[in-house]
Amino acid sequence: MSEQQEQEQSDKQKYEFRKVIEELKGYQGSGTQLVSIYIPEGKLISDVVAHVTQEHSEASNIKSKDTRTAVQDALTSIKDRLRYYDVRPPDNGLVVFSGAFDTGGGRTDMVTKVLESPPDPIESFRYHCDSEFLTEPLEHMLADKGLFGLIVLDRREANVGWLKGKRVEPVKSASSLVPGKQRKGGQSAQRFARLRLEAIDNFYQEVAGMANDLFVADRHEIDGILVGGPSPTKDEFLDGDYLHHELQDMVLGKFDVAYTDESGLYDLVDAADDVLAEHEMLRDKELMEDFFKQLHNGDKATYGFDQTRQNLNMGAVEQLLISEDLRKDVVAYTCENGHDEYDLINSSAGTDDHECSRCGATVDADDGEREDAIDHLMELADQRGTETVFISTDFEKGEQLLTAFGGVAGLLRYSTGV
């Protein structure tokens, strides 16, 4: 599978998970009766069933009859679902949600959802019972991923590590032999200053060596390098060209950080929040810039569901741009005279009868075939060798894609006049 195909598969999986998360976040229990269970892939299913059985027994002590019944029903449903799995969960683990949610008017309904093989591995077993489903761990998995090198240093110590997605991984550390500013007796001021500068230089070389050993081999995978520490130290380190020249060119910024132990790596990520957010959206911004250039000065852009769909069918779309906040369904109608037409509707809206624009024949709402608009477009894109890219709404032109262009656009291989 090519890198582009892997990225598209990952984007599609993330979209499917995002839809489920949004649905789960919409459920509200009247008490602590919504159960969430996160199961890592190494966990024995039999151990999970035993845990659920124990929770079911303990739930009999809940004073509220409604809450007690709801929790026990949820746990029974979870046990039933777990029977479909063998010894262990699938790759990356398994998440099960179950519980009774309010539907209004004092009524409730039951929901059970099973999410297999999330985008990232589930790190630990977790049982959670509350008035809301626990979705935060999954939301973190859907955050934009990147690989960044981290360096924090002062003249006493240094730490280097990785930022992988949202996870900081400290890897190497070093302590310096740089003497304090007060010289020992018997040393001339000039000799002390020279020895101190040599010690500083040696320490900077040691830090650069750690960084080079860690980062150079992966330099083609790294999105950038962040450097933190007190102002004089980090400036001297970067201005002195101690880093490998290819790494030096990858430095995204330097940041004031008070601590240079392992905790300083976390402080560095916090200090670089704006830079990281900007970098995550860089590709989205470049694609939207290309789209607007073609829209105003060229003829290789299309937008809107109908036009983009036509261009997809022609095989003319190089890159399909979809707003990550698009929530629409497409309803396909075929009238009695064989005309195929499509309506784009809100995901929460009902389906209406359709009047064919070509012959005026009416198609009953029940005869329309409804599916998620993004799934519909991505299937066409897969068939035509078109790359699908989800565009964030966290910048101006990304927001415009959703609000002004219907959430769907495309960069074309050639002009079609459509």
From Swiss-Prot:
- GO CC annotation: cytoplasm
Subcellular location(s) per record: Cytoplasm
Q: Which GO terms describe its molecular function?
A: translation release factor activity, codon specific
Q: Which domain of life is it from?
A: Archaea
Q: Which keywords has UniProt assigned to this entry?
A: Cytoplasm, Protein biosynthesis
UniProt lists the family membership as follows:
Belongs to the eukaryotic release factor 1 family.
Protein name (database record): Peptide chain release factor subunit 1
- Gene that produces this protein: prf1
